[in-house]
């Protein structure tokens, strides 16, 4: 079976993009809400679903094909978060509510179009990816949204309408997820090439 026919049989595990809970510039919470939906609706086993934080030591990562892109230029994010569905039945798919690519998009297409390659980038822009199991993300992630306030306490971008996400242990641990030191936080940290090799078409 080739990738095209496998993709045509893929069952989407979230609402359509315009029906998802979405707040601009709060990608970490948008993905948390996707994980919550998948857990509640049981469209697939939660162990097939991962939150993927993309960043690096300098917090400068280029991603192409974003809604805020200008033409063919990438957006340089400090970090970005997407959802990975690593299905046991076929190719992996990416759910990115900020892309102009299909929602969802096969990992192979997303990696070619949105990630492209680190080969022609300066090392300061090389991407790393922290891959966290969906269940762990739901249980452990917390954000008081303070990173979205300026020095005067004003919102840089309007926050989500629902309450802040917190755990019994923490009200703010976002930096542990953005950090690409494998000794810190949850999940596994990959280089871009290792991520694509591990989760891409076998």
Swiss-Prot record:
Disulfide partners: none
InterPro entries linked: N_Gln_amidohydro_ab_roll_sf, NTAQ1, Prot_N_Gln_amidohydro_ab_roll
Molecular function GO labels: protein-N-terminal asparagine amidohydrolase activity; protein-N-terminal glutamine amidohydrolase activity
Subcellular location: Cytoplasm, Cytosol; Nucleus
Short name of any one Pfam family annotated for the protein: Nt_Gln_amidase
Positions annotated as active site in the UniProt record: 27, 80, 96
Lineage: superkingdom: Eukaryota
Keyword field: Cytoplasm, Hydrolase, Nucleus
GO cellular component: cytosol; nucleus
One of the GO biological process terms: protein modification process
Name recorded for this polypeptide: Protein N-terminal glutamine amidohydrolase
């Amino acid at each position: 079976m080739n990738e095209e026919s496998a993709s045509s049989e893929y069952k989407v595990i979230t609402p359509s993009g315009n029906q998802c809970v979405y707040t601009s510039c709060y990608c970490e919470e948008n993905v948390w809400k996707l994980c919550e939906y998948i857990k509640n609706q049981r469209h697939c086993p939660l162990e097939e679903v991962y939150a993927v934080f993309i960043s690096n030591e300098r917090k400068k990562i280029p991603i192409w094909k974003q809604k805020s892109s200008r033409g063919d230029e990438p957006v340089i994010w400090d970090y970005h978060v997407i959802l990975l569905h690593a299905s046991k039945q076929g190719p992996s798919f990416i759910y990115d509510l900020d892309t102009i690519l299909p929602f969802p998009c096969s990992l192979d297409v997303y990696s070619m179009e949105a990630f492209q390659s680190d080969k022609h980038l300066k090392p300061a822009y090389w991407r790393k990816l922290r891959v966290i199991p969906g269940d762990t993300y739901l249980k452990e992630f917390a954000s008081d949204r303070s990173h979205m306030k300026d020095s005067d306490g004003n919102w840089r971008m309007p926050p989500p309408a629902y309450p802040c996400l917190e755990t019994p242990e923490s009200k703010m641990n976002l930096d542990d997820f953005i950090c690409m030191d494998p000794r810190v936080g949850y999940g596994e940290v990959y280089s871009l090439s290792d991520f694509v090799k591990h989760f891409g078409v076998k």
